Amino acid sequence: MLFRSTECLASVPESTNIWQFCVILPKAQIGENCNICSHCFIENDVHIGNNVTIKCGVQVWDGITIEDNVQIGANVTFTNDKYPRAKNPNWVLEKTVIKRGASIGAGSTIGCGITIGENAMIGMGSVVTKDVPAGELWFGNPAKFVRKIEV
C-alpha cells in the first residue's frame, strides 16, 4: 500500500522535526517538539509522546509506546514478536512501553513485551530481555542492573 506523505504527516505537529528518508505510517501518533532523525520507520499502532528524540536508523513497530521526554539512540532495534515466522496465523502482538524520561543507548535491542521504567537508562549495545525498573541503569548482553540513577 502506498501512502502520500501529506496523508502520513497530517497528524504530526508543526513543532516536531522529521528528517529525510523517514517512513511514518498514517495512524502513528506523534507528539509535540519531537525530533525524528533520518532513516527511521514508524508503524501505525505507535504512540510517541512529547519532547522525544529518536536518532537515525530506528524502526518503531506496531505496539510500541514511547512516553514524553525519552531519548532513543541511533540504530536501536525494537521487536514486537517473540516467536517470528514468515506466516503465523497465531501471531500475538507483544506491546512494549518506554516510560517518561527513559534513555536507550545506541545499538541496543529491546525485546517485546517489556516496560522500561521512568528515567531508566539502557547502556549502548545492550540487549534488554526483561522489564527495567524506574530510575535504574542497565547494561550488557543480556542487560543487567548496574546502579540506581539520581534524577
Residue spans of the language-model regions?
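Flexible, glycine/small-residue-enriched loop-and-beta-strand segment within the central core
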Residues: 3-12, 18-115, 141-143, 147-150
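Short hydrophobic beta-strand segments in globular cytosolic domains
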Residues: 105, 111, 123, 128-129
